[in-house]
Amino acid sequence: MTHRSNLLPAFFALAMAGMPLVFAQHENGKKENVLYVWASDQAHKAPDFLAVVEFNEDSAHYGRVISTVPLPPPGNTGNEPHHCHLSTDKKVLACGGLLSLLKGQNGIFFFDVSDARHPRFLLSTKAVESSITDDFLPLPEGGFLITQMGSASGEAPGRIAEFDGQLHFVANHFGLMSLVQEWPSTPPLDGFNPHGISARPDLNLMMTADFILPTSTLNGTTGVALRNTVRIWDYRARKITKTVKLMSPDGGPALGIMDVKMLPGDPNGIGYVAGMFDGHIYMIDPRTGTGTAAFDCEDVQPHVDTPVVGGMGQILATPKSGDRLIFALFQAGQVGMLDTTNRSNLKQVPGAIVSFGANSGPHNLVLTEDDSRLVVSDYFLNEDDQGVIHFEGDHKVRVIKVTHDSLTEDTRFQLDFNTAFPTGPARPHGLAMK
């Protein structure tokens, strides 16, 4: 029997009441000086861990690992660390374990980062009707919406798990946040496997992107089932109002909609998604519930030939100017910028592209609050002997300097997770800055 104690209700208090999330300012007007990287030991022997990295550009140790915070046992290996996100008040870091289910472990982890350079592990937990934890959307009032790509058994339908800001400690290191709900109350049965999530609370709109049926990627299954749907939500009611089924220009379905990003400030709530295996970026119009191809990644210059058409577009990032979209191509090894002035016909910003080399694997993209730096992690997912997904990347974490019309690699920042730790090569995935 577990025993709850030490209620900590304050971690997710709103930092600036009434301020829209996408326009939050730096705490005390300061730039981020600490980078968190949520990672795993490639050999699955050392614990999964949070790396704390010097992110102060004025420091002589810029780009060096300050410390690591390993997960405590039990359940501290084999979680496949995936995405992470800071709470609105930047005091708690929430992290996900994509494959925790395969070992019967909790898959949602929380760290106290109120002392930015000395984070400490708080607790782990899991949802009830869902698993395969993916992305986190911090809520202005505290807590998170979390995409759970699979059901409790890793199949369909998945859910959006909502946790409020009440933290409860229980016996051992396991715990429960106050789980408000898993949404929607009656989930659709047409391939609801949400991966990406984006919201415009000011418009009462939210979007989620269905990517893949998780269990279909495991050994012994009949084949990978990719999804091509985007869900439009009533943000406040937590209710799906429209389902957008995307078709590629060749007439077939879009293949694997991993991420979704809504443009800041767009009056209609326009968003964008990338078809990972069909090579297109699609515009989503929530008013009409439609999606159309807006850019062909085969047209990216310089062009890199890759096994997957379009170089394998995955994660997107949206500067607050509202007229730019940043994308990463995993197999092409490129990070580029698109002009979104014409919402349905995106154009590559001339010269705004950084090439790291074919198969370097840029995947996760996170902008600083002032949009001046973009952090990139070069690792997606390797299921090793458990499944058919083997997208390793080169395990580097990089920084790109960003202006309205340019992307330039910050060569002062050098961080290679193959050599940074005495335990051996590690796989960097989740990113957050404070």
PLM region spans:
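Loop/turn-rich, solvent-exposed surfaces of beta-rich toroidal or solenoidal domains
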Residues: 306-390, 395-397
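Short, conserved, GDST-rich strand-edge loop motifs in beta-rich repeat architectures
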Residues: 37-44, 95-105, 147-158, 208-227, ...
